[in-house]
């Protein structure tokens, strides 16, 4: 969907745009906010990300889908990454004001030569025994660092699949909740073709898969996962130290990443 320049500059969607974004996520499982990040900003972040990715693979790009997490410092903690205001506004409207996330965040990369990935969900239904889908508990925000095209591996998604409850034992027992091609063929799919600087808000239960990158460019997008607050903080959450940057983070970012508050961590030790 197209967001007005005024909304982008103010970091706030108007009531009608927010209503449409919420409805789109609830009905289809995702919404794309096109070109809400400037080309200059995207270029700077992309260069830094690719430098880190190449460092992690020791300069030898694998022909696969993967990713990695950048160091939690400097521009990698830009508030437009860790707490994008438009994405946060949508998520809070869907999952409540008390959402939280974890650090480090990751990225989804289709390296040149990457193949077709299996069809899967990133998050299961909370109560798979129920015959209906509950409201979302996990949402991922993706930031496209390059133009997404069919040639470079724009992700394939199955709109509305987040509302389909899995009943097949082979799917329920699969650690990746993979679907067969035949089963997924019953639902329609689309490719997430979008310009660089677009922000995607996606229900993590939606079926999707990485697609081949037939170009010589690295097709990367940032991936930041957010959770509905309905239980205590999981003990297995990464204990990343961001005390050196805590004071530079926005009030909204500190709220979302409140479990990383250095004062609270010190009191728990």
Predicted regions and their residues:
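Short, conserved beta-strand element in jelly-roll/cupin
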Residues: 128-150, 193-196, 224-228
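Non-heme Fe(II)-dependent double-stranded beta-helix
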Residues: 2-27, 34-130, 237
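Short edge-strand/loop segments of extracellular domains
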Residues: 109-110, 158-165, 225-231
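Non-heme Fe(II)/2-oxoglutarate
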Residues: 2-3, 8, 59-60, 86, ...
């Amino acid at each position: 969907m197209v967001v007005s320049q005024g909304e982008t500059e103010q970091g706030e969607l108007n009531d009608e745009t927010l209503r449409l974004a919420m409805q789109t996520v609830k009905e289809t499982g995702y919404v794309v906010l096109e070109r809400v990040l400037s080309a200059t900003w995207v270029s700077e972040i992309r260069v830094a990300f690719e430098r880190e990715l190449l460092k992690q693979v020791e300069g030898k790009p694998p022909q696969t889908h993967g990713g990695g997490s950048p160091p939690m410092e400097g521009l990698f903690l830009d508030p437009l990454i860790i707490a994008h205001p438009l994405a946060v506004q949508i998520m809070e409207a869907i999952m409540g004001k008390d959402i939280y996330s974890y650090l480090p965040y990751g990225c989804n990369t289709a390296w040149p030569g990457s193949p077709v990935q299996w069809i899967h969900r990133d998050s299961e239904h909370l109560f798979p025994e129920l015959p209906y889908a509950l409201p979302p508990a996990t949402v991922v925000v993706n930031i496209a660092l390059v133009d997404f095209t069919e040639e470079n591996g724009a992700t394939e998604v199955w709109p509305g699949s987040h509302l389909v409850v899995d009943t097949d034992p082979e799917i329920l027992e699969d650690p990746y909740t993979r679907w067969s091609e035949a089963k997924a063929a019953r639902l329609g799919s689309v490719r997430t073709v979008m310009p660089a600087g677009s922000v995607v808000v996606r229900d993590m239960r939606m079926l999707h898969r990485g697609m081949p990158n037939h170009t010589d460019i690295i097709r990367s997008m940032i991936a930041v996962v957010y959770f509905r607050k309905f239980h205590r903080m999981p003990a297995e959450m990464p204990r990343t130290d961001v005390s050196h940057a805590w004071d530079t983070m926005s009030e909204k970012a500190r709220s979302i990443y409140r479990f990383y508050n250095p004062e609270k961590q010190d009191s728990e030790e």
